[in-house]
């Protein structure tokens, strides 16, 4: 909903540079593709909404799995082709962690891979290297079986292997302490899945 809101309305925002509007629109197309990817993997076909609607108007019929993949690829291709979306942010840049062409190539390649189109997936993954991304290597050149652990330390959260990563915030008191109640036990952080939707409640959303 929020991604569609930005995509459809950001052009009407006054006193904002057109290049910034284009970049933000591309970022939101990535996020819309991200959401529809996970919906399509789970349900193999869902209603496609490219505009904001009220809950009472959410009555579209279910689109096919192939149609959803097509929309996902279209959004990611728009990201890649957007000249105002950078390929990669430099370390220390205040925008590091935002969506880039590198993230769009990676996610489109990931999508092609899931679809079984390995040639296109490989082409996208190879394009990432051309943008300056590379596998993590310790700066001191010492190799060991614990190198991989260093990749996830705050000091390396902006290394060249990071394509799309949430940036560490060391300040305490951020976030929501109840979030752990909702996740599945197999998710990172060992969530508790204390709250589960009632099947009858879920069925209320099958409108078409």
Question: What is each residue range found by the language model?
Answer:
Residues 77-78, 83, 98-208:
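An aromatic- and glycine-enriched ligand-binding surface/loop that stacks and positions planar moieties
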Residues 40-47, 114-117:
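Short coil/turn linking the two alpha-helices of tandem helical-hairpin repeats
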Residues 36-38, 45, 94-102:
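Aromatic-lined, polymer-binding surfaces characteristic
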Residues 43, 55, 130:
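Residue-level signal for pocket-adjacent positions within structured domains
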Residues 46-51, 138-141:
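Short, charged hinge/linker segments at domain and secondary-structure junctions
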Residues 1-43, 59, 63-70, 76-90:
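Conserved, well-structured interaction surfaces
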């Amino acid at each position: 909903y929020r991604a569609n809101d930005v995509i459809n309305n950001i052009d009407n925002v006054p006193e904002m540079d057109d290049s910034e509007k284009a970049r933000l629109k591309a970022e939101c197309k990535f996020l819309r593709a991200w959401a529809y990817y996970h919906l399509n993997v789970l349900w193999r076909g869902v209603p496609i909404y490219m505009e904001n609607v009220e809950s009472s108007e959410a009555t579209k019929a279910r689109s096919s799995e192939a149609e959803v993949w097509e929309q996902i690829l279209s959004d990611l291709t728009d990201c890649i082709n957007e000249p105002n979306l950078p390929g990669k942010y430099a370390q220390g840049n205040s925008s590091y962690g935002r969506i880039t062409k590198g993230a769009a190539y990676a996610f489109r390649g990931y999508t092609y891979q899931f679809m079984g189109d390995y040639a296109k997936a490989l082409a996208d993954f190879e394009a990432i290297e051309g943008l300056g991304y590379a596998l993590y290597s310790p700066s001191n050149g010492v190799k060991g079986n614990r190198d991989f652990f260093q990749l996830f330390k705050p000091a390396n959260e902006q290394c060249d292997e990071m394509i799309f990563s949430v940036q560490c915030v060391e300040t305490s008191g951020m976030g929501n302490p109840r979030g752990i109640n909702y996740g599945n036990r197999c998710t990172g952080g060992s969530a508790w899945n204390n709250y589960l939707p009632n099947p009858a409640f879920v069925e209320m959303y099958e409108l078409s």
